[in-house]
């Protein structure tokens, strides 16, 4: 069961690079689909957002922490991200938790706040 996520988001396309942007978007979907079929990730979601002047959309890749660490080192994954960074603004790649990873991270947080004096 997935306990970790990679959240990959992007903003607006750089003007004049929209066609290449669509190509790279489709390459990413194909790559993540192959990774899922090969068992290298558990699943992925694609979300396109309504125009808002900031966030255009995101991929959410789910898997174990070990799977996602391997994904980050995958040459094809890195190539797709490099291509994407040249055609969109505000690209972000953020690690996160899901499933059992939430309980693990909440436990760490509870442990940390126990060490901090609480004030009203």
Model-predicted segments: where are they?
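Short S/T/G/P-rich N-terminal loop/turn motif that feeds into the first structured element of a domain
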Residues: 1-55, 63-73, 93-120
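Mid-chain, well-packed structural core segment of small domains
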Residues: 60-89
């Amino acid at each position: 069961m997935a306990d970790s996520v990679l959240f990959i988001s992007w903003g607006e396309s750089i003007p004049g690079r929209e066609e290449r942007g669509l190509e790279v978007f489709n390459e990413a979907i194909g790559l993540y689909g192959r990774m899922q079929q090969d068992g290298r990730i558990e699943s992925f979601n694609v979300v396109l957002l309504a125009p808002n002047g900031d966030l255009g959309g995101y991929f959410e890749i789910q898997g174990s922490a070990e799977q996602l660490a391997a994904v980050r080192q995958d040459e094809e994954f890195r190539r797709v991200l490099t291509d994407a960074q040249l055609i969109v603004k505000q690209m972000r790649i953020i690690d996160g938790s899901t499933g059992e990873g939430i309980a693990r991270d909440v436990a760490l947080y509870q442990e940390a706040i126990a060490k901090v004096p609480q004030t009203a």
